[in-house]
From Swiss-Prot:
UniProt xrefs under SUPFAM superfamilies: Scorpion toxin-like
Similarity-based family: Belongs to the DEFL family.
Major subcellular location class: secreted
Function noted in UniProt: Confers broad-spectrum resistance to pathogens.
Residue spans crossing the bilayer: none
Subcellular locations according to the entry: Secreted
Gene name in the database record: PDF2.6
Highest rank taxon of the organism: Eukaryota
Pfam families, alphabetized: Gamma-thionin (PF00304)
Key words, A-Z: Antimicrobial, Disulfide bond, Fungicide, Plant defense, Secreted, Signal
Protein name, UniProt field: Defensin-like protein 10
Lineage, broadest ranks: Eukaryota, Viridiplantae, Streptophyta, Embryophyta, Tracheophyta
Signal peptide: 1-28
Length: 73
């Protein structure tokens, strides 16, 4: 009886460790909105990212020739 209890305990601990290491860190969702202040066709994501903080966003990127600002929701 003692051996089977130890075996069950060891198996349970192994399963718990397996699941604990399989979970990764959780990231916040990213919300995007078209920029209101960026003028012209967006070809360079760096210039888009520089325009977005003035609109209250943390960054930005070009997509479909338009500047989209982003921040954590």
């Amino acid at each position: 009886m003692k051996l089977s209890l130890r075996l069950i305990s060891a198996l349970l601990m192994s399963v718990m460790l397996l699941f604990a290491t399989g979970m990764g860190p959780v990231e916040a969702r990213t919300c995007e909105s078209p920029s209101n202040k960026f003028q012209g066709v967006c070809l360079n994501s760096q210039s888009c990212a520089k325009a977005c903080p003035s609109e209250g966003f943390s960054g930005g990127r070009c997509s479909s020739l338009r500047c989209y600002c982003s921040k954590a929701c």
